[in-house]
Amino acid sequence: VLTEEDKSRVRAAWGPVSKNAELYGAETLTRLFTAYPATKTYFHHFDLSPGSSNLKTHGKKVIDAITEAVNNLDDVAGALSKLSDLHAQKLRVDPVNFKLLGHCLEVTIAAHNGGPLKPEVILSLDKFLCLVAKTLVSRYR
């Protein structure tokens, strides 16, 4: 459960991310595909080279979807409902990939922070991204 302090920290940390969605998204996906090559399975039709237009476009979609969750921290499930259905029922993405994506996104945020993230910010981001992952797998049966 996100506290009001968590929500405040997430919103503050997310500002630069949402303003640079394509950059953060593409970099996060590059980290994901590099660290966890099995995640490439769902993107066989993409050019997965760093900086490709496919990574930029899909990365922006990912960040925009998470931004919607940030903008609705009191109803993350509602904000991500359609996306959860899509990934569970149509795309059938392995649920563990959402957790891996969250970790890669945290690293990307930290890399662009200009210095170490404060422990309480890391904790709040981690709680939020775990909530996002949990929400996205909620439609799996």
From Swiss-Prot:
Gene Ontology cellular-component terms listed: blood microparticle; haptoglobin-hemoglobin complex; hemoglobin complex
UniProt protein name: Hemoglobin subunit alpha-A
Q: Where in the numbering of this chain does the Globin domain appear? A: 1-141
Query: From the record, what ranges are coiled-coil?
Result: none
Cite the binding residues for heme b: H87
A Pfam family cross-referenced in the UniProt record is Globin
Tissue specificity annotation: Red blood cells.
**Origin species:** Drymarchon melanurus erebennus
